[in-house]
Structure formats: C-alpha cells, structure tokens
Amino acid sequence: MILVSTSTVKITPTGPYLPCFVSGNPLRSEKTNKVHDCFECTVIVFKINNKLMVWGEIDIIEIDFRLADTMRKSVQKMYNVPYENIIIGTIHTHTGPETLEENAFGMDEVKVVPGYREFLVKKFEEAVSECFNKE
C-alpha cells in the first residue's frame, strides 16, 4: 500500500528576519527590507509498504550539511523516519534571504540573520508534522 501526504508552509522572512541580505549576490553589500516573492517549504511524506520517506524542498539558495543534518535528525527523532530516507533540496534562488553561516564567496562577514536558520528548522518540522497529522 502507498500513502502520500503533502504540506507547504511559508518561510518568507518577516518581522525579526528583516532586514536581511539577499543570497548569492556577493557584490550587494546592503540589506533589504523588501520582499518581492513569497518563499515556501514543501514536504511530501511517503509510506510505501510501511517504509517511511520524507522529501523536502525549500525556497532558498542552498542548504549546508549542518542545517540539513539538524532537520533530518529532528524528523528522525519525531517520527522514526530513517535518516537516509529524508531528502532535502533547494530551488537555488538568488532572490531569497541568506541562509549560510559560512560565506560562499570567502568574505569574512556572516550574513545570515540571527535566528533565521532555527526558524527554517521549525518550519520544516511544522510541514512534516502537518503531513503526519493529516487523515
């Protein structure tokens, strides 16, 4: 038997996450207060013959190992999904908020807004929980 559930949550920076740097633009040195597009995190959960799989897509430029590892371990603990069955990808947008703790362009300044990475983890957990709690 195959069971499938999906959920989408908003991850657009607001409130304490603005202003923020825009990701993937090394020549842009200023922060922005404006949001041109809404950003989302979409999760799909499969249960195929009692085997659980979680696939996530996040509207950010990229996800580093540390952030993905935190998300995967959280879902593993919450729902007993095998770590290797949790896949997280990104759309690689250059118009979203900065999410990396280490600057990809070799600059000294870390440009991610404090707390935004933790916000992403919570929103990923929320989307996964919505999938598991649907009837």
Which residues make up each language-model segment?
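Conserved beta-alpha junction segments in alpha/beta enzyme cores
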Residues: M1-G89, T93-E135
